[in-house]
Amino acid sequence: MAKVLVLYYSAYGHIETMAYAVAEGAKSAGAEVTVKRVPELVPEDVAKASYYKVDQAAPIATVDELADYDAIIVGAGTRFGTVASQMRNFWDQTGGLWFAGKLVGKLGSVFTSSATQHGGQESTILGFIPTFLHQGMVVAGLPYAFQGQMGTEEVKGGSPYGASTITNGDGSRQPSEIELEGAKYQGAHVAKLAAKLA
């Protein structure tokens, strides 16, 4: 049974919702799944004043525990076309794991969100993939076998690089059913691949 970590950062709850959908998909494929988040870097008073969702139930991850999993599925919103600094900061602390080769051969995957359809989702996912490759990890996305990412009948996130959601500039749009299905598919896809690699 593959051990999968869904590791996320979510300021307003959209990525948190996607993370649990990813976890559901991974569990459906037989994986042992853990959902954790990275630490918040914004001072608590500023976060509350900015209406961040500060009451998230997932425990905080530690860098060293990354080595305990067969696959790590990372989720974070895009910030100006790249991954949120909270997630970047967490992975910037993995030098010891890199030096010891602790993540070599493990599977990595990414999902994200943005306020607009062209708000940097693909650049965020593609920009994170080198982190996995430097660690010696194998990368998986969201294959076109998930047909939900096809078509133009509605506004929706998702690409072959990974699941995603569009939130609107005011954060009022929650992940749609098709976006959550994409997240579940990605979780299941990664879990199946991780079981083969483990």
From Swiss-Prot:
Record: residues binding substrate: W98
Reactions catalysed, as given in the entry: a quinone + NADH + H(+) = a quinol + NAD(+); a quinone + NADPH + H(+) = a quinol + NADP(+)
Note on how the cofactor is bound: Binds 1 FMN per monomer.
Protein name as it appears in the record: NAD(P)H dehydrogenase (quinone)
Enzymatic class: oxidoreductase
GO molecular function: flavin adenine dinucleotide binding; FMN binding; NAD binding; NADH:ubiquinone reductase (non-electrogenic) activity; NADP binding; NADPH dehydrogenase (quinone) activity
Domain annotation Flavodoxin-like: ranges: 4-190
